[in-house]
């Protein structure tokens, strides 16, 4: 099982629990090259389409930015997993999410907040990194470890500079934008680093969070589109 497979398997129960029952129509934005949750959604009886410029080929995917996607049916649920923190225009993207959903439709968001990744949390993750597989691209934690070491800067400054250069939105900004457009139903901070650590489980990361050794960097959120007034 790849790290991406582990991540999808770990998050899928939350996603499924928050969505309306099948056969609801679900759109996943930012499904990536592997197709995200679309296969699991289909297996669970949902009508599902994944949207991403790098999506797989096939009838269940659209290779386009979600801001320009025209769903084939009214959308009962939208899933956005690690898709919002790097959009070019956050307000425009969130407005589009709201417009995609039918009134009363469900939005499920899985994200991370870079501003909560303090030095202690980063070092905890770095210490648990395995060497990259031969021929494989280094993971995101590997890249941060090497770039931070090469920068010679304090961790907080390095991370702020990276986020600014990459246009990564703070988790608090994403959350505020969501709450301004949707009726929040659920929000919690969750483990996130395990997604890049082959030998560390979500439960082990949660134990370190509970012990106060590290901070929870992940975010899980669910909300509904408010019914129109009147």
Where are these regions (language model features)?
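A short glycine-rich, Lys/Arg-flanked "PGG" loop and its adjoining helix->strand segment in the class I
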Residues: 92-103
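Conserved class I S-adenosyl-L-methionine
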Residues: 23-32, 108-144
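Conserved alpha-helix/loop element of class I SAM-dependent methyltransferases that forms part
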Residues: 4-23
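C-terminal lobe and adjacent flexible extensions of AdoMet/dcAdoMet transferase-like proteins
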Residues: 181-230
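A conserved beta-strand element that flanks and buttresses the S-adenosyl-L-methionine
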Residues: 79
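Class I SAM-dependent methyltransferase SAM/SAH-binding core
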Residues: 32-68
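Substrate-binding/catalytic lobe of Class I Rossmann-like enzymes that use SAM or dcSAM, i.e.
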Residues: 138-200
């Amino acid at each position: 099982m790849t790290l991406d497979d582990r991540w999808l398997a770990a998050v899928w129960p939350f996603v499924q629990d928050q969505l309306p029952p099948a056969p609801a129509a679900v759109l996943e934005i930012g499904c990536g090259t592997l197709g995200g949750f679309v296969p699991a959604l289909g297996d669970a009886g949902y009508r599902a389409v994944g949207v991403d410029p790098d999506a797989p080929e096939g009838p269940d995917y659209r290779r386009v930015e979600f801001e320009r996607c025209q769903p084939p049916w009214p959308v009962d649920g939208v899933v956005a997993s690690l898709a919002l923190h790097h959009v070019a225009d956050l307000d425009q993207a969130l407005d589009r999410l709201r417009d995609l959903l039918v009134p009363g439709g469900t939005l499920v968001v899985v994200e991370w907040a870079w501003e909560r990744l303090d030095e202690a949390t980063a070092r905890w993750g770095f210490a648990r990194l395995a060497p990259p597989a031969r021929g494989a691209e280094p993971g995101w934690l590997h890249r941060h470890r090497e770039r931070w070491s090469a920068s010679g800067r304090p961790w907080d400054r390095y991370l702020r500079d990276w986020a600014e250069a990459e246009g990564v939105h703070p988790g608090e900004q994403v959350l505020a934008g969501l709450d301004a457009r949707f009726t929040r139903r659920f929000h919690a901070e969750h483990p996130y680093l395990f997604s890049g650590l082959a030998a560390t489980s979500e439960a082990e990361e949660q134990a370190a969070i509970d012990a106060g050794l590290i901070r929870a960097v992940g975010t899980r959120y669910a909300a509904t589109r408010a019914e129109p007034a009147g």
